Curated annotation (Swiss-Prot):
Domain of life assignment: Bacteria
Family per similarity comment: Belongs to the cycloisomerase 2 family.
Descriptive protein name: Uncharacterized protein YwcC
GO molecular function: 6-phosphogluconolactonase activity
SUPFAM superfamilies recorded: C-terminal (heme d1) domain of cytochrome cd1-nitrite reductase
Protein's gene: ywcC
GO CC terms in record: cytosol
InterPro entries, per the entry: Cycloisomerase_2 (IPR050282), Haem_d1_sf (IPR011048), Lactonase_7-beta_prop (IPR019405), WD40/YVTN_repeat-like_dom_sf (IPR015943)
Length: 341
């Protein structure tokens, strides 16, 4: 069986925008790199249920988000919503409210867009974060993530301030702060993912290479720390920046990518999700594994390397969580986002 995977990334060198590849699950092989949409710096991409593709984007007006109608093969441009400044770094769809959320790293902003009848977008709210952290990379707010909690609130991660902010979403797309969780100073809060039970979350720190295991109180929208665990081996002392974090749909295994150590860390998750145990590290066979994702059956993990321009394919043992390399040299330039269809 062949599955399609969408890829987003930078367009600084050779990439033209969004691409697709095919995964042959029987042959354990990636093939057929094809251009889907020409867009500048689509570093994060997402789809809604109607087949609209939303990407981070830049144009002559500045940075923001681009909308496309995607038929499974090609994408028709519906328009950009951009403002002065750098593009977004994360986009997510809220199907229930028909909204799209965006995180702007450089401006320290959270943006909300309303999906129009044809799939195009209209900006409805912008929230500016303020503050800083102790590290040189934290001179100001850097919102790196904006997506939904299991109970339908919006949660953001701010790498610059080490804060995780939970918002209530009001009306046609206005944000009101519900709670703020303050992670360890200098962590560099980048992304967060939730256990399938909706009561536990895992916050990854780009700057200190750790994961904080958090309880989540749905009634109040409040996080509390349960555990902190490293993403690196004890004997590694080189540079590293953690990037992506994913949990299997059965809640048994968690994975993170390490840029510098150039590995995936595999964790065993306790039955209630409250504790992580490190299983080991897998060399990703490339440089700067910015993103990775499961295929739709979670039998495979596809890893994208931003600097070495290759995808690696790993077979995943669902019983043990361990990874076996199947392919490491598939060319895909400047990729920073992997999205299975």
């Amino acid at each position: 069986m062949k599955e399609k995977i969408l890829l987003g990334g930078y367009t600084k060198r050779v990439s033209k925008g969004v691409y697709s590849v095919l995964l042959d699950t029987k042959a354990a092989e990636l093939s057929s790199l094809n251009e889907v949409a020409a867009v500048q710096n689509p570093t994060y991409i997402t789809l809604d249920e109607k087949g609209h593709l939303y990407t981070c984007a830049a144009d002559s007006n500045g940075g923001g988000i681009a909308a496309f109608d995607f038929d499974g093969e090609t994408a028709t441009h519906l328009g950009n919503v951009t403002t002065t400044g750098a593009p977004l770094c994360y986009v997510a769809v809220d199907e229930a409210r028909q909204l799209v959320y965006g995180a702007n790293y450089h401006l320290g902003e959270v943006r909300v867009y309303k999906i129009q009848a044809n799939g195009s977008l209209r900006l409805t709210d912008t929230v500016k974060h303020t503050g800083s952290g102790p590290r040189p990379e934290q001179a100001s707010s850097h919102v790196h993530y904006s997506d939904l909690t299991p109970d339908g609130r919006l949660v953001t991660c701010d790498l610059g301030t080490d804060e995780v902010t939970v918002y209530d979403v009001i009306g046609e797309g206005k944000l009101n702060i519900a709670t703020i969780y303050r992670a360890e100073k200098g962590m560099g809060a980048r992304h967060i993912t939730f256990h399938p039970n909706g009561k536990i979350a895992y916050l990854v720190g780009e700057l200190n290479s750790t994961i904080e295991v958090l309880s989540y109180n749905e009634e109040k929208g409040r996080f509390a720390r349960l555990q902190t665990i490293s993403t690196l081996p004890e004997d590694y002392h080189g540079a590293n920046g953690v990037a992506a974090i994913r949990i299997s749909s059965d809640g048994k295994f968690l994975y993170t990518s390490n840029r510098g150590h150039d590995s995936l860390t595999t964790y065993k998750v306790s039955p209630l999700g409250t504790k992580l145990e490190t299983i080991g590290w897998t060399n990703t066979e490339g440089h700067i594994p910015r993103d990775f994702n499961f295929n739709k059956t979670e039998d495979y993990i596809i890893v994208a390397h931003q600097e070495s321009d290759n995808l690696s394919l790993f077979l995943r043992d669902k019983k043990t969580g361990t990874l076996t390399l199947e392919q490491k040299d598939f060319y895909a330039p400047e990729i920073t986002c992997v999205l299975p269809l």
